[in-house]
Curated annotation (Swiss-Prot):
This is U11-theraphotoxin-Hhn1a. Keywords: Disulfide bond, Ion channel impairing toxin, Knottin, Secreted, Signal, Toxin. Belongs to the neurotoxin 14 (magi-1) family. 01 (HNTX-16) subfamily. Residues 61-83 are annotated as: Disordered. Residues 22-74 form a propeptide. The presence of a 'disulfide through disulfide knot' structurally defines this protein as a knottin. GO terms for molecular function: sodium channel inhibitor activity; toxin activity. It is found in: Secreted. GO terms for cellular component: extracellular region. It comes from Cyriopagopus hainanus (Chinese bird spider). The keyword Signal applies.
Length: 113
């Protein structure tokens, strides 16, 4: 029984010491990986920020290039009376004489093309 204890005790001490060393190594590896991951995340974050800033600059340039006159003026929707001489129907609509309804109100309405 003593020989079993004598052989078991050094094996146990060796296993504990190696296990502790492995635990410390694992902890160090995890810290290194975490630091590498943080640096990678910082790099990715900076890259994404640069791309977003470039996109924002492009969008602001496009907005500043448009003038107020380039916007579509107010238009008349479908089925709304319009003036034959000055039709302000929205895009995709045409100022036409109605076929059935509206004959007695105004002579022209905005209809789809």
């Amino acid at each position: 029984m003593n020989t079993v204890r004598v052989t078991f005790l050094p094996v146990f001490v060796l296993a504990v010491s190696l296990g502790q060393a492995d635990k410390d190594e694992n902890r160090m590896e995890m810290q290194e990986k975490t630091e590498q991951g943080k640096s990678y995340l910082d790099f990715a974050e900076n890259l994404l920020l640069q791309k977003l800033e470039e996109l924002e600059a492009k969008l602001l340039e496009e907005d500043s290039e448009e003038s107020r006159n380039s916007r579509q003026k107010r238009c008349i929707g479908e089925g709304v009376p319009c003036d034959e001489n000055d039709p302000r129907c929205c895009s995709g609509l045409v100022c036409l004489k109605p076929t059935l309804h509206g004959i007695w109100y105004k002579s022209y309405y905005c209809y789809k093309k």
